[in-house]
């Protein structure tokens, strides 16, 4: 396992970066955030296909990553949804400035050589 210490340390840094958003951020929510960061302009259908999550799980995570979560709790404000110009009944997703900042921090953590937790 020692051969993999560097890679595992990198994963640890990424997890620590996600934990700055919320200490108990679900993996599904992180996965949805990353999918939107990779492919801005995704629809909920695209996101469900890309992540293999149910439509209910995708919608729950979109709300958590947006302005308002379930039960009117504040969301993380990492993504925003806007009407799709090609089909106005459909919404497409983009990172907010706060989401772009988190994506940049994740990339920085990925490239860092420092041990996790330092």
What are these regions (language model features)?
Residues 6-22:
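Short, Lys/Arg-enriched N-terminal segment that forms or immediately precedes the first helix
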Residues 17-54:
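N-terminal helix-turn-helix DNA-binding core of bacterial DNA-binding proteins
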Residues 66-73:
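C-terminal flanking helix
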Residues 76-84:
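Short, basic, alpha-helical segments at the C-terminal edge of helix-turn-helix-like DNA-binding modules
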Residues 85-103:
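Basic, amphipathic "hinge/linker" alpha-helix immediately C-terminal to the N-terminal HTH DNA-binding motif
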């Amino acid at each position: 396992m020692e051969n993999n210490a560097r890679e595992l340390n990198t994963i640890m840094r990424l997890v620590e970066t996600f934990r700055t958003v919320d200490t108990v951020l679900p993996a599904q929510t992180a996965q949805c955030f990353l999918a939107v960061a990779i492919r801005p302009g995704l629809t909920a259908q695209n996101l469900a296909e890309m992540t293999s999550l149910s439509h209910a799980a995708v919608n729950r995570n979109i709300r958590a990553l947006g302005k308002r979560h379930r039960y009117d709790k504040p969301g993380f404000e990492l993504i925003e949804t806007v009407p799709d110009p090609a089909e106005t009944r459909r919404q497409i997703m983009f990172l907010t400035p706060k989401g772009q900042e988190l994506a940049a921090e994740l990339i920085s953590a990925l490239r860092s050589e420092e041990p996790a937790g330092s």
